[in-house]
């Protein structure tokens, strides 16, 4: 009865919006999932070192956020999109407990896809910025991971050949400060982590984006003046920057796109629009396709 009720509600909404292909969707009731006990056993096994009992696992497995991550962990789905009715913390917690971070990554972060009206920047006005969502004050190791993950996100969701700029208020030693030192150290680590990625720093934003300024401030840099991936030194900078671009530049900001998790899990704003949802569905699918290719 409950399953029919859920299906009826979804089908009624689909009819209202003129969606004729809802029959292609698998509609799941967490309370009545045929693999509920199997997933409870899996969760108990994954969390046994934390003292989880099978009774606790059975209670959690009916939570859609936990169930979704368990379905992914078991190989029965490729990604999850949630958050329209949940906090970021509630979305991330089961993802980190069950799916965990990607190999070699300890820092989860969030990228923003910026669709600007300035085709002279990035690739026809398309840029990706990180971190804008998760890690407030990353250290050099974390910042390097953010750079690599943001480059991979740019490849997966925007089809970009990433040209990564590590941003700062200094360009190539023009200013001295411990914050600049962190960016320089992060650049070194990122190059060691992913030698295949084109990356440079530290660069001021104008030096990263404007060819003439890049040539003047960082001669010889292949990234300066041509960056399409912008890595900021802190969450504070990232959050402020993308919102300024969005509001003052009338750019479309798509995201945040969570990165650093072993399989795609994305978090919607509780104020999300229908357009936000379908864009993030497409992005999550692209992340899943890229993850499968990388695993082959």
Go through the PLM ranges and name each one:
Residues 8-224, 229-296:
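Anion-binding alpha/beta catalytic cores of soluble intermediary-metabolism enzymes, centered on
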Residues 1-6:
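Short, small-residue-biased leader/transition segments that mark boundaries at the very start
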């Amino acid at each position: 009865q409950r399953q029919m009720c859920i299906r009826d509600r979804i089908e009624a909404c689909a009819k209202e919006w003129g969606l004729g292909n809802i029959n292609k969707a698998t509609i799941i009731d967490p309370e009545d999932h045929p693999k509920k006990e199997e997933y409870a056993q899996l969760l108990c096994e994954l969390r046994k070192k934390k003292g989880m009992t099978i009774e606790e696992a059975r209670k959690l497995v009916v939570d859609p956020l936990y169930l979704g991550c368990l379905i992914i962990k078991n190989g029965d789905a490729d990604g999850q999109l949630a958050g329209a009715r949940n906090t970021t913390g509630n979305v991330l917690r089961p993802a980190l407990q069950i799916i965990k971070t990607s190999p070699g990554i300890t820092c989860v972060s969030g990228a923003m896809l910026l669709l600007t009206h300035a085709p002279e920047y990035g690739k026809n006005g398309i840029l990706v910025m990180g971190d804008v969502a998760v890690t407030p004050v990353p250290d050099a190791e974390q910042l390097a991971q953010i750079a690599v993950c943001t480059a991979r996100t740019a490849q997966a969701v925007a089809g970009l050949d990433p040209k990564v700029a590590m941003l700062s208020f200094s360009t190539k030693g023009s200013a001295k400060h411990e914050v600049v030192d962190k960016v320089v150290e992060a650049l070194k680590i990122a190059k060691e982590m992913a030698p295949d990625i084109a990356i440079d720093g530290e660069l001021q934003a104008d030096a990263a984006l404007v060819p003439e300024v890049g040539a003047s401030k960082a001669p010889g840099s292949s990234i300066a003046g041509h960056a399409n991936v912008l890595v900021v030194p802190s969450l504070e900078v990232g959050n402020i920057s993308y919102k300024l671009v969005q509001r003052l530049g009338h750019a479309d900001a798509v995201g945040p796109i969570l990165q650093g998790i072993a399989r795609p899990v994305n978090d919607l704003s509780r104020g999300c629009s229908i357009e936000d949802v379908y864009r993030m569905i497409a992005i999550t699918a692209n992340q899943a396709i890229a993850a499968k290719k990388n695993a082959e």
